Amino acid sequence: MTDIVVVRVKPGSRKGPLVETGSDAELTIYVRERAVDGKANEAAARLLAAHLQLPRSRVELVAGATSRLKRFRVER
């Protein structure tokens, strides 16, 4: 089963690494890595996989590589 998960990523955050669920069920991922050379994207994917209790190989960034709003494909 494949799902698309939309998340807001906050790179360079002192609050991270953390996954927060907002009142509207939106996921916000705080990562310490800066948005340089895809490091924040990779950190967000790792953190999302851990939050969903899945291996990292089952989480793939499909949209939003240069945006804070990202879409990940999740294989369950």
Swiss-Prot record:
Gene3D superfamilies: YggU-like
Coiled coil: none
InterPro entries, per the entry: DUF167 (IPR003746), YggU-like_sf (IPR036591)
Lineage top rank: taxon: Bacteria
Pfam families attached to this UniProt entry: DUF167 (PF02594)
Family from the record: Belongs to the UPF0235 family.
Protein name: UPF0235 protein MMAR_2910
Organism: Mycobacterium marinum (strain ATCC BAA-535 / M)
